[in-house]
Amino acid sequence: MRILVTNDDGIDALGIKRLVEALLTLEGAEVSIVAPVEEKSGVGHGITYRSALSPEQRDFYGMPVKAWAVNGNPADCVKAAYHLLFEHGKKPDIVFSGINVGTNLGRDIYYSGTCSGAREAVILGVPGVALSYDNWFDQDNYGDVVEMIRPLVKEFSDRAIKGELASEVFWNINIPHVPLAEVKGMVPATLSMNHYEDKYSEEAEGYYLAREYPQVMPLAEPLDYDLLKHGYIAITPVHIDATDRTLLKQMDNWALLKAWGKQEE
């Protein structure tokens, strides 16, 4: 099984090391790492095409893996790995992106470099999984995360090999920062559309964006934000086709479109 790993915190981040540790417990796993040379948090799905990418092969903590650092974004890393670094006919069977420092919940998926790594995999026809850990305020502490994700990476890897993961969908997984014994379960989750409150603080060199998190609500609905804060691992399938087909149908009644009519072939 060929597994590609990327992230947005950079190749030297502790989270990607923990992810690789979990992946190396899988039988027959051939792990390759292609990750940014420096942190690329919040870059969304940006790609590099006006400057050259220069993948640099390097050692990765002495682990039995191949690793490259790339002067680009997470989506660049996956794209470059797919087209340049994997041998012809030996493309990855699955891509894991993470483990991110801090969560990627709700609308975060549009800003997240971690999610873009998984999304780019799906664009290229490979299953993609994004993993994030709720340790933003305790960034050097990954606790029991390896034990938490080991069954997850096995499940998704097994399903990828069997062709059981839906195409056009990447998987967004958020993990609570609690001991393993306190995890209440793994549950399917809907993206929360709660709004963050954006605030800018003025410093000597300019303005910094700070985000205040919404209030945690009772579990009336299976929303990723609330589930995570209540101690659950939240798993969300995210479709990359963002077309609103209900509105698309309604547009047939727009006067403007009727006036112009459909173009003849």
From Swiss-Prot:
Write out the GO MF terms.
5'-nucleotidase activity; metal ion binding; nucleotide binding
Look up the record and name the cofactor or cofactors this protein needs.
Answer: a divalent metal cation
Task: From the Swiss-Prot or TrEMBL record, state where the protein is found.
Answer: Cytoplasm
Q: Tell me which UniProt keywords the record has, alphabetically.
A: Cytoplasm, Hydrolase, Metal-binding, Nucleotide-binding
Q: Which reaction does it catalyse?
A: a ribonucleoside 5'-phosphate + H2O = a ribonucleoside + phosphate
Q: Which InterPro entries match?
A: SurE, SurE-like_Pase/nucleotidase, SurE-like_sf
Identify one Gene Ontology CC term for this UniProt entry.
cytoplasm
Task: Give the EC number(s) listed in the UniProt record.
Answer: 3.1.3.5
The record describes how the cofactor is bound as: Binds 1 divalent metal cation per subunit.
Q: Establish whether keyword Hydrolase is in the entry.
A: yes
Report the domain of life of the source organism.
Answer: Bacteria
Q: Which Pfam families match?
A: SurE
- Residues the entry annotates as binding a divalent metal cation: D8, D9, S41, N100
Q: Which SUPFAM superfamilies match?
A: SurE-like
Q: What class of enzyme is it?
A: hydrolase
HAMAP family xrefs: SurE
Q: What does the sequence similarity comment in the record state about its family?
A: Belongs to the SurE nucleotidase family.
Q: What does this protein do?
A: Nucleotidase that shows phosphatase activity on nucleoside 5'-monophosphates.
User: By its UniProt entry, which NCBIfam families does this protein fall under?
Assistant: surE
Its protein name is 5'-nucleotidase SurE
Organism listed in the record: Brevibacillus brevis (strain 47 / JCM 6285 / NBRC 100599)
